[in-house]
């Protein structure tokens, strides 16, 4: 595309489409700015892999948890909610964003123009606040084990509140997202006839900046700070408890289990924060001064940041499910199209909020009074 066409479009002052915290830049570039075919092919493979892993991983996780009655505890209910929101992101966010960024015009119609960013914003809000509720449950189980503990009913209520909050905070995308051909109206080239762009058209730049800044705090910095505080307190408590047990007896298994829990807790939070940090920085910089980012580098930089953020949809099934032996065993049945067998006697009950393994019902029936006393004592120390 020549520089004259670029100037014509720039006169309309419509350079970008900020969609659910995911900026979309209308990069009307010259020929030197086009991404190489090899790069496009590589990005397409990467996006395809993330979509497949995100959809299959979260779908498997949801089916496995819902299929097993033994697994319907507070944390697993929240994990299903988290996986469902990640599933929506993988379906509604990845393919549409990738195609739109490469094509620089919207081809999916007016309904999807409004629905796509709305669903994306809802899904991301649900994901981060599901992590918040999981952190709250873990905090109560570890820091205050004899105090208030969330029940399944509390989990369902919390999920309902999360979705209401997510929908309410995402409504501006339904209201202000528009499908228009305004950037192409004065363009005479046939290639741009009947082409449309999808972008948010707020009342003013100040309104848009206020809203996007609110989302930045609501969807990233605020929840992450809260989660880090909860897990830091958990880490301190587990460390003290581990030191006390080392003084009382040599318990290498418990020490190893505590260490694994600490690594798991830290990995969950760090993975989410690291995945979303590049896109968060990109959107923040672009919102306040989009001219900082060179036009030719915009699409590629955005896609790399966006792809990194979307990897988080694949990480959650790994951390919450596939590192669990029960999930690994059930996953084999899932992909072999076999029925899940009932394991009332030998199913290994996992308190996902702590990754603590309880003994099976069979072993409880065969345990001696001394062993039962020890088991109950260990249950009081559940983390």
Swiss-Prot record:
Superkingdom assignment: Eukaryota
Matches recorded under SUPFAM superfamilies: Family A G protein-coupled receptor-like (SSF81321)
Keywords carried by this UniProt record: Cell membrane, Disulfide bond, G-protein coupled receptor, Glycoprotein, Lipoprotein, Membrane, Palmitate, Phosphoprotein, Receptor, Transducer, Transmembrane, Transmembrane helix
Glycan attachment positions: 2, 11, 17
Cellular-component GO terms for this entry: neuron projection; plasma membrane
Residues that span the membrane, as ranges: 45-65, 77-97, 117-137, 155-175, 212-232, 261-281, 300-320
Annotated coiled-coil segments of the chain: none
Family designation: Belongs to the G-protein coupled receptor 1 family.
Protein name: Neuropeptide Y receptor type 1
Organism name: Sus scrofa (Pig)
Lineage: Eukaryota, Metazoa, Chordata, Craniata, Vertebrata
């Amino acid at each position: 595309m020549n520089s004259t066409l670029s100037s014509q479009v720039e006169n309309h002052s419509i350079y970008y489409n900020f969609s659910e915290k995911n900026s979309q830049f209308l990069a009307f570039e010259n020929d030197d700015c086009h991404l190489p075919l090899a790069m496009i092919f590589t990005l397409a493979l990467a996006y395809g892999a993330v979509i497949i892993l995100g959809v299959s991983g979260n779908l498997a996780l949801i089916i496995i948890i819902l299929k097993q009655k033994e697994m319907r505890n507070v944390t697993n209910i929240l994990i299903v909610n988290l996986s469902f929101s990640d599933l929506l992101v993988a379906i509604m966010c990845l393919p549409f964003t990738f195609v739109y960024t490469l094509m620089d015009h919207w081809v999916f119609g007016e309904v999807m123009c409004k629905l796509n960013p709305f669903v994306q914003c809802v899904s991301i809000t649900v994901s981060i606040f599901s992590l918040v509720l999981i952190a709250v449950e873990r905090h109560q189980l570890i820091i205050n084990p004899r105090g208030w503990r969330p029940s399944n009913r509390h989990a369902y209520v919390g999920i309902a509140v999360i979705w209401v909050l997510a929908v309410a905070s995402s409504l501006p995308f339904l209201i202000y997202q528009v499908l228009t051909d305004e950037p192409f109206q004065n363009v005479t080239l046939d290639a741009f006839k009947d082409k449309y762009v999808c972008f948010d058209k707020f009342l003013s730049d100040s309104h848009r900046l206020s809203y996007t800044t609110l989302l930045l705090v609501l969807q990233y910095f605020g929840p992450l700070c809260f989660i880090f505080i909860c897990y830091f307190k958990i880490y301190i408590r587990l460390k003290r408890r581990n030191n006390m047990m080392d003084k009382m007896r040599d318990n290498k298994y418990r020490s190893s289990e505590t260490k694994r829990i600490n690594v798991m807790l830290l990995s969950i939070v760090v993975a989410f924060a690291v995945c979303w940090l590049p896109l968060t920085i990109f959107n923040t910089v672009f919102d306040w001064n989009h001219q900082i980012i060179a036009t030719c580098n915009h699409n590629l930089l955005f896609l790399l940041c966006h792809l990194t953020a979307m990897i988080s949809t694949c990480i959650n099934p790994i951390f919450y499910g596939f590192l669990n032996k029960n999930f690994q065993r059930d996953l084999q049945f899932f992909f072999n199209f076999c029925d899940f067998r009932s394991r009332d006697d030998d199913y290994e009950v996992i308190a996902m909020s702590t990754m603590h393994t309880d003994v099976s019902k069979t072993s409880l029936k065969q345990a001696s009074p001394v062993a039962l006393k020890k088991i109950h004592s260990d249950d009081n120390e559940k983390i």
